[in-house]
């Protein structure tokens, strides 16, 4: 090779290097000049399936228990043991794929993902890297997204859609913990081999809030399908997030920044905090002329910061290989159609049903959060007489679910799980029917509800008689007489009211309510008083 050609290649290399630096510097300058960086988020969610036994063994699959009390020989990787696929887990994965509007694969396969931890006795995890059971799909997030870190075009119409790349079956690992004396690691294999699905999203979210909305939507779907209880606090749903940032120029060109993975976020609040912190960290690094490195990080809930677990140089090489002890998983179209024919109403459909029936978006959102709360609403509606759907929804969302959550001290569990039998949906429906027909006022209904929440199981009529004196005064003549007496006893207030001091009407209504022990309907009282003050009999 001649010196001339070497010089030419050297010059070409320098030009390319200069171009890279220039492009990078433009991106930094753009960010520094006020061109806001866009946050890009994807999620990887591991969901424990509600199966009686584990994915590849007959050992019981349940949360908790004495350490190592639910371990089959295969779970402990004893020599000579082989995996036997749980058909129930397959059916749940198919059901989830249908709900996500994904493409259920009639032929999928299992792989070995090799790595070593003390709680992984096989030295590999059985998963579906090459050929997952579901490809594609979408999560439709209900509700209004708003806040400081909401995406621009996604924060007003509640129409966030997050694409799903894949859903794959895999087995869970055991659980490691540090011994009390700090001298060793304890391993509990109760969780080892439990059936999981991993749900991998597209990078379609633009904030921590949108990531939370996606996970919440998935939680609801999983619960309605009875695929999982999806309780993050018990590890039934574990979330990893991938975070990157990019300039408007990069967005226009359809390219993404270097991503960082944050592992094992175990609450919705942690997801939002971790994404927000990591996006800010990226922006700070880039503004200082640095470069984002691909790495895996964890989130410290105490400091609100992410911490490096593994750098790019130390990322694991899992050496995926086909699972030799399991044949391909083959389904038929009839299998998939049979499962599709048994699909329940999903939360988004339930939400639309409630809103179209007149319930507010806020109350509807609260009610459809759990299948049990939706069922409670439906049973109450069947027993509420002429009560409007909107009134029933608001009462249940605010007075019952709200009170139950306050008593439980948590919002992540089913709020009605500890509701007393006295406050059944049927009895609450009948109570609201009495409000609709004028027997009770809204205030009276709340007083009766308090008795029900305190496990008062007497007949509803007896409770109404005891607490509300039988309900609102139903005789117009009796109520008119009381209003006349108030007008006679308050001549100065009446004179001022007739002179235009309209606020005094409230004082007169209050006096009538006092004389009736709260049993009068304030609207009826106000109308009667207005007629009397105007000179009508």
From Swiss-Prot:
EC number(s) per entry: 6.3.5.-
Reactions catalysed according to its record: L-glutamyl-tRNA(Gln) + L-glutamine + ATP + H2O = L-glutaminyl-tRNA(Gln) + L-glutamate + ADP + phosphate + H(+)
Top-level EC class: ligase
ATP-binding found in the keyword field: yes
Record's keyword terms, sorted: ATP-binding, Chloroplast, Ligase, Mitochondrion, Nucleotide-binding, Plastid, Protein biosynthesis
GO biological-process terms attached to the record: glutaminyl-tRNAGln biosynthesis via transamidation; mitochondrial translation
Leftover remarks: This protein may be expected to contain an N-terminal transit peptide but none has been predicted.
Family: Belongs to the GatB/GatE family. GatB subfamily.
Assembly notes: Subunit of the heterotrimeric GatCAB amidotransferase (AdT) complex, composed of A, B and C subunits.
NCBIfam families documented for this protein: gatB (TIGR00133), PRK05477.1-2 (NF004012), PRK05477.1-4 (NF004014)
Protein name: Glutamyl-tRNA(Gln) amidotransferase subunit B, chloroplastic/mitochondrial
Source lineage: Eukaryota, Viridiplantae, Chlorophyta, Mamiellophyceae, Mamiellales
């Amino acid at each position: 090779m001649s010196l001339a050609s070497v010089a030419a290649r050297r010059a070409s290399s320098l030009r390319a290097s200069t171009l890279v630096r220039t492009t990078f510097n433009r991106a930094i300058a753009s960010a520094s000049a006020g061109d806001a960086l866009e946050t890009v988020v994807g999620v990887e969610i591991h969901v424990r399936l509600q199966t009686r036994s584990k994915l590849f063994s007959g050992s019981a699959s349940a949360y908790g228990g004495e350490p190592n009390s639910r371990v089959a020989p295969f779970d402990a990787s004893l020599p000579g043991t082989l995996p036997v696929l749980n058909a129930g887990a397959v059916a749940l994965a198919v059901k989830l794929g249908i709900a996500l509007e994904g493409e259920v694969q009639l032929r999928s396969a299992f792989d070995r993902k090799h790595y070593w931890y003390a709680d992984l006795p096989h030295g590999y995890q059985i998963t579906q890297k090459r050929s997952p059971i579901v490809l594609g799909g979408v999560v439709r997030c209900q509700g209004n997204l708003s806040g400081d870190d909401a995406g621009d075009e996604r924060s007003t119409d509640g129409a966030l859609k997050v694409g799903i790349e894949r859903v794959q079956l895999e087995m869970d690992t055991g659980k490691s913990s540090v011994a009390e004396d700090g001298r060793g690691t304890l391993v509990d294999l109760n969780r080892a081999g439990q059936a999981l699905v991993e749900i991998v999203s597209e990078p379609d979210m633009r904030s921590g809030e949108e990531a939370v909305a996606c996970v919440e939507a998935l939680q609801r779907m999983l619960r309605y399908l009875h695929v999982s209880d999806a309780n993050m606090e018990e590890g039934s749903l574990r979330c990893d997030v991938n975070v990157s940032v990019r300039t408007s120029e990069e967005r226009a060109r359809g390219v993404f920044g270097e991503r960082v993975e944050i592992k094992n976020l175990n609450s919705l609040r942690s997801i939002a905090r971790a994404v927000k912190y990591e996006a800010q960290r990226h922006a700070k690094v880039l503004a200082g002329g640095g470069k984002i490195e691909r790495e895996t990080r964890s989130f410290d809930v105490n400091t609100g910061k992410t911490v490096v677990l593994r750098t790019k140089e130390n990322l694991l090489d899992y050496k995926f290989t086909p699972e030799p002890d399991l044949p391909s998983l083959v389904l038929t179209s009839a299998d998939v159609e049979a499962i599709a024919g048994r699909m329940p109403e999903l939360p988004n459909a339930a939400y639309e049903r409630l809103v179209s029936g007149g319930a507010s978006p806020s109350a509807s959102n609260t009610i459809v959060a759990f299948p049990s709360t939706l069922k409670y609403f439906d049973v109450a509606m069947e027993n509420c007489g002429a009560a409007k759907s909107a009134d029933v929804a608001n009462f249940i969302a605010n007075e019952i679910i709200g009170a139950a959550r306050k008593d439980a001290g948590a919002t992540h569990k089913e709020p009605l799980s500890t509701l007393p039998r006295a406050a059944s949906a049927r009895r609450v429906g009948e109570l609201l029917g009495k409000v609709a027909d004028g027997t009770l006022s809204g205030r009276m209904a709340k007083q009766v509800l308090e008795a029900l929440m305190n496990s008062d199981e007497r007949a509803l009529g007896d409770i109404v008689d005891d607490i509300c004196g039988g309900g609102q005064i139903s005789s117009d003549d009796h109520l008119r007489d009381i209003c006349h007496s108030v007008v006679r006893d308050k001549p100065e207030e009446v004179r001022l009211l007739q002179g235009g001091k309209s606020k005094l009407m409230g004082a007169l209504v209050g006096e009538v309510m006092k004389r009736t022990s709260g049993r009068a309907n304030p609207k009826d009282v106000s109308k009667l008083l207005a007629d009397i003050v105007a000179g009508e009999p």
